[in-house]
A protein has these predicted regions:
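Short linear Ser/Thr-Pro motifs
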Residues: 9-11, 30, 97
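N-terminal beta1-alpha1 ligand-phosphate binding loop
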Residues: 1-23
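Short glycine-rich, Thr/Ser-proximal phosphate-binding strand/loop in the N-terminal lobe
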Residues: 24-39, 115-121
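Generic alpha-helical hydrophobic packing signal
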Residues: 15, 28, 109-111
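Anionic-ligand binding patches
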Residues: 2-6, 40-154
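Short loop/helix-cap segments at secondary-structure boundaries that form the rim of catalytic
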Residues: 16-20, 37-38, 59-60
Length: 154
């Protein structure tokens, strides 16, 4: 039996990143309920989210290699996921303006028999952002499917 590589995400950015290494994979978005997940730190939270997404898809694809990921922005202990509205995106961007924060990405890989997960974190510093820049940016579709309302890759 040939196992497949499955990306447990509907994220266009995750698809793009994985495509840099291989085009031989399938995409199956997870139906994992993130709302009930809690943790004592943002890094632990994102690892649990990635693991939950990965295992939810792996349960439907035994024997395949499933990759699940999640990212959160940590601003002094406050977790920013994807903004829920224009005002939420503006609030996040104002908090990030001129400040340093952490970005945590959880990664989980499972083949059904073994599951491994880890977190990678980095510090990001924003230059100050004007209200006009925030208004222009939030008027686009860019911030609404990204943790912290921004994508560092552009």
């Amino acid at each position: 039996m040939n196992s497949k590589l499955i990306l447990a995400s509907g994220s266009p950015r995750r698809k793009e990143l994985l495509s840099l290494y291989t085009t031989d994979f399938e995409i199956h978005a997870s139906d994992f309920d993130e709302s009930a997940v809690t943790a004592d730190t943002p890094a632990r939270l994102v690892e649990k989210l990635a693991r939950g997404k990965c295992l939810a898809v792996a349960a439907r694809h035994p024997g395949d290699l499933v990759l699940g990921c999640d990212t959160v922005v940590d601003v002094n202990g406050e977790v920013f996921g994807k903004p829920h509205s224009v005002e939420d995106a503006k609030r996040m961007l104002r908090a990030l303006s001129g400040a340093t924060h952490q970005v945590h990405t959880g990664v989980c890989v499972s083949d059904g028999a073994q599951t491994k997960s880890f977190v990678d974190s980095c510090r990001v510093t924003f230059f100050p952002i004007s209200e006009e820049e925030i208004e222009r940016y939030t008027a686009t579709k860019e911030p609404y499917d990204k943790a912290g309302a921004y994508a560092i890759q552009g």
